[in-house]
Amino acid sequence: MISIEQVTKEFGDIRALDQVEAQISENSIFGLAGTNGAGKSTLLRVISGVLRPEKGQVKIDGLPVWENPAAKRRLCFIPDTSCFFPNATSEMMRDYYRVIYPGFDSGRFDELLEQFGLDPRRKIQTFSKGMKKQVSVLLGICTNTEYLLCDETFDGLDPVMRQAVKSLFASEILNRKFTPVIASHSLREIEDICDHVGLLHRGGILFSRELDDMKLDIHKIQCVIPDPLKEEELLCEMEVLQHSKRGSLLTVIVRGSEEEVERKIMEKQPLFSEILPLSLEEIFISETEVAGYDIKNLIF
């Protein structure tokens, strides 16, 4: 488990992280969402031990990360900008990583290069942005570390390669102790892969929750209730996060159990009612607006 304990990081007068508190459980995929400048990259660098926080600390399985090689051996950090030696090939980077990470699997790396169609002898600097990202991810996977910190991993990948990387992550979780932490400015990028999602804004985590719990607890309903008084009663009786109306069609996002929500709607004798699936984006918009934030100005 990664424990982030009241972490504050400053750059001069700028407070990039402000008392961040979070827990990242083992064998889950943690998504860290937020706009550019929200503090995602800084937080990943603090977790990896690249940056030292002014206050607080990060622990990996109970071990403080800062200046602790034993803790750092448990993780690998993939930055948002791919970093390779000048004129390096994938083979050369493989040999370098093998020295740094004792558990690096060279044979697996060679196999994955072939699967992804990457020439091991071609200079990486001649690769496209997406191809460089692929090499970075494959190197990170093959370190066999327990934790993989990924900063904008899917940025620059086409849809096919994005799905291939997601499948690779899922395979690793099934076959060994593996916990990826994926930072992204796009909720859509992480919705279909992450188990747990945290929203970072202005250096602090607004909230962090299991994705399944969010979707079980919040519902989107569209209904037509001919009696205006009963419609008003419905809005008062439910925990409404958002509502809008077009003509006679009422759209409501509410918190509560699906059975209870359905029961209250049917009591109002609707002409039509339907519970619709919610996207992660819609859930976050509803949650943050209740907290006093306009997420439309924070993300997307």
Residue ranges and their predicted role:
Residues P69, K215-I218, L235, I265, ...:
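Short, flexible helix/strand-to-coil boundary loops that buttress conserved ligand/catalytic motifs
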Residues T89, E210, L276-S279:
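Short loop/turn segments at beta->alpha junctions
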Residues L148-L149, T153, P228-E231, E259-E262:
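Short, surface-exposed beta-strand/loop "edge" segments at domain boundaries and coil↔beta transitions
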Residues I253-F300:
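C-terminal coupling/interaction segments
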